[in-house]
């Protein structure tokens, strides 16, 4: 993973996770003069917050309102990051049933969601470093499944996004587009992912590999 993003320092012990839930730790790349791979809690707590429970409301940030929302506008200017993943889950309605899908790049490889991070310092205790994932309109693959999708940054845009010296906010906003659908794919996975208690490689295996019929 470090090689995929040109990381120079790994500051935390990062363990694989196959079913990430809000408030879990996620792997994040940032650039503070040195490109680092760190762990952050998913769910952004604004620096001005009085209660860290706000994190549950801020797991995602809409690209269209980043410069307007108090929770995100300062982080957008100064604290941009990549949230590392190799796919994400969405649930497709089929009658009264919701079918879990794992959506990934084709061929499968790690990528970075466009993210923001914050450092929250309570009156007492240790600082809390949290992040959010930016969403945008869905592409042709995701549109039948959900009305939003996370922003996946192309490789050639990652360094520009991470550069805190960049002040051209319009160019930054222009990066927050749906990823090319032809370079993505999806497959049905087990309903194990419906419970955050389940966090094993089986969560991201195609159901056909587990002896179940595929959806498509």
What residues fall within each predicted segment?
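Short linear sequence motif anchored by a di-proline
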Residues: 1-216
């Amino acid at each position: 993973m470090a090689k995929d993003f040109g990381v120079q320092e790994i500051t935390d012990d990062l363990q694989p996770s196959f079913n990430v839930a809000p408030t879990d730790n996620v792997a994040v790349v940032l650039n503070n003069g040195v490109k680092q791979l760190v762990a952050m809690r998913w769910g952004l707590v604004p620096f001005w917050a009085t209660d860290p429970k706000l994190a549950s409301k801020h797991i995602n940030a809409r690209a269209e309102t980043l410069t307007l929302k108090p929770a995100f506008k300062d982080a957008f200017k100064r604290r941009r990051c990549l949230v590392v993943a190799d796919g994400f889950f969405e649930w497709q309605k089929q009658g009264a049933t919701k079918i879990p899908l794992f959506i990934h790049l084709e061929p499968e490889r790690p990528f970075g969601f466009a993210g923001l991070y914050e450092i929250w310092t309570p009156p007492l205790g240790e600082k809390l470093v949290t992040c959010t994932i930016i969403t945008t309109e869905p592409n042709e693959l995701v549109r039948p499944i959900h009305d939003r999708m996370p922003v996946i940054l192309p490789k050639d845009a990652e360094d520009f996004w991470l550069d805190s010296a960049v002040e051209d906010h319009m160019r930054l906003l222009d990066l927050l587009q749906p990823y090319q659908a032809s370079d993505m794919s999806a497959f049905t996975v087990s309903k194990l992912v419906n419970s955050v208690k389940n966090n094993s490689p089986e969560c991201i295996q195609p159901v056909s590999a587990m002896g179940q019929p595929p959806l498509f």
